[in-house]
A protein has these predicted regions:
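Generic short beta-strand segments
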Residues: 85-92
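Outer-membrane beta-barrel domain signature
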Residues: 97-98
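A solvent-exposed, acidic/Ser-Thr-rich amphipathic alpha-helical stretch
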Residues: 6, 19-79, 86
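Short, surface-exposed coil-to-beta transition loops
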Residues: 67-69, 84, 102-107
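Extended, polar beta-sheet/loop recognition surfaces of beta-rich domains
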Residues: 139-141
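Generic hydrophobic alpha-helical segments
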Residues: 9-10
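Short beta-strand edge/turn micro-motifs at domain boundaries
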Residues: 102-135
């Protein structure tokens, strides 16, 4: 297993709205800076709470997310890795697949190997901010 595998697990667990599988790729002491709703999440329990709320909302709205990674750069050593990329989240109606909306965020994932398994120990998502109005710029990609 390499660090790329973690990104594929991230992508498929979101699409399947599988909370347990999604949080299984994170270290118990993960520290996340998220650009949605919460400034940060410290520890797996806090992150799992946020993810559960997110996936429940998707299910209630009858939506699935398709995740796509662009411009992925991964640096990997024997026990540490980092990846940075653009991540597009496209919401689709579960019933007929109609695309509803999409956004692209910038992401950095920092991983460490624990007992031959890569785990995300730090994640940072961001958007550029408009200098004119101070709002996140969603449509640049």
């Amino acid at each position: 297993m390499n660090a790329q595998y973690i990104l594929e697990q991230y992508k498929s667990a979101i699409h399947e709205r599988d909370v347990e599988r999604f949080v299984s790729i994170y270290d118990p002491n993960v520290h996340i800076y998220d650009c949605w709703g919460h400034w940060e999440s410290k520890g797996l329990a806090a992150w799992q709470e946020n993810v559960t709320e997110w996936f429940i909302g998707l299910k209630a709205d009858g939506e699935i997310l398709k995740v796509d990674f662009q411009d992925v750069v991964i640096e990997e050593t024997a026990d540490l890795a980092f990846a940075h990329c653009a991540v597009t989240f496209a919401a689709h109606k579960e019933s007929d697949g109609e695309k509803l909306r999409q956004i692209t965020n910038r992401f950095t994932f920092c991983m460490k190997k624990v007992r031959d398994t890569w785990l995300i120990v730090h994640e940072h998502s961001s958007l550029p901010i408009s200098m004119e109005d101070g709002k996140g710029m969603f449509g640049l990609r």
